[in-house]
């Protein structure tokens, strides 16, 4: 497993958003393992589903990792959007996509946004009560999911398409294995 690092100049960037505890990404992360979630845009049915699924898992699964969202919008956009899905969500406003770009998130292809697998995932999200809304941010941006500790990226989910995301309720067990493996690699 490859362990990547978050560059210092990214960690030291000032942040603003909702329910934040610090002024830079480094301070916000501290040394605790954290799940970084980059949402596509607020109108995205899959982003709404992902936030709601993470909120449910965080409130019901023991030892769920601390979660920090990034979104392409203003502070006001975040204050309006997140309380509908998870009032306690911590989220960084990243309208210029500085953090999105730093973590290598790209724009999706036509197939990644509208392919057959995406439609099937849309049915899944709609069955959970989620629907498409007006985009806030670039609707072609792919989502991102990274498990980090301090400046180390321990794991990431490689999204195949806009509706692809892991089972958030079982994610802590997977991440615990990743963390043990990574710790052993760093010690040796």
Model-found features: residue ranges?
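Chalcogenol-based redox active-site neighborhoods
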Residues: 1-188
């Amino acid at each position: 497993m490859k362990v990547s690092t978050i560059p210092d100049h990214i960690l030291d960037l000032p942040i603003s958003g909702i329910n934040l505890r610090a002024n830079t990404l480094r301070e916000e992360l501290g040394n605790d393992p954290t799940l970084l979630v980059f949402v596509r845009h607020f109108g995205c049915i899959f982003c709404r589903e992902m936030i709601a699924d993470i909120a449910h898992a965080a409130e019901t699964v023991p030892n769920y990792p601390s979660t920090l969202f990034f979104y392409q919008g203003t502070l006001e956009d975040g204050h309006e959007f997140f309380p509908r899905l998870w009032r306690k969500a911590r989220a960084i406003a990243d309208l210029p996509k500085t953090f999105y770009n730093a973590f290598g998130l790209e724009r999706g292809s036509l197939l990644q946004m509208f392919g057959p697998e995406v439609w099937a995932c849309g049915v899944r999200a709609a069955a959970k009560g989620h629907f498409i809304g007006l985009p806030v941010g670039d609707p072609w941006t792919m989502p991102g999911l990274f498990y980090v500790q301090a400046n180390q990226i321990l794991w990431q989910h490689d999204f195949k398409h806009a509706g692809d995301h892991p089972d958030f309720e079982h994610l802590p067990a997977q991440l615990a294995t990743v963390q043990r493996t990574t710790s052993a690699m760093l010690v040796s």
